[in-house]
Amino acid sequence: LEAYRRGALAERSLTAFDAESGRKLWTRPGNYQTRPIIVGRTIFAEPWFFDLAGGAAKTGPQGKPLELFRGSGCGGFAASAGTAFFRAGAICYRPFDAAGRIAPLVSGQRPSCWISFVPAGGIVVAPEGSAGCTCPYAIQGSVALYPKDLPAETPRPADK
């Protein structure tokens, strides 16, 4: 994380355009690692968060920039409204709030090297992505996670 704080990837920038006219709205240095994603009115570009409307860095309760740095792992991020899903040694997640910690969803299972999570409607689906990989992970299989209190009208995986 210190390398990013020093500007290790300062040549990477973020630019926003008006969708109707194509006019450039703003541009700023990004200094980010992976492809940015947009969640609501926020751009997340590992390890930073930026305001979509003006490009300003988002800050936490103490006025410090919000950060989410996974430490290791390749591949992109996927996100729901409040949580990032990514590869960091296993299938991991972290709430976007400043106090959230990175936690494994499923230990021993490796997602693919590319974006391989689908968080939508309260459900997270992670298709198998390690077959043929040289990384040593024990579990090869797809995962679908949903809360116990999912409303009855929501489609569920078939009961066996």
Predicted regions located by residue number:
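Aromatic (tryptophan-biased) beta-strands that constitute blades/sheets of beta-rich domains
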Residues: 13-32, 54-75, 97-109, 113, ...
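Catalytic-site beta-strand/loop segments enriched in glycine and acidic/polar residues
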Residues: 94
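Repeat-blade elements of multi-bladed beta-propeller folds
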Residues: 1-15, 27-49, 69-91, 110, ...
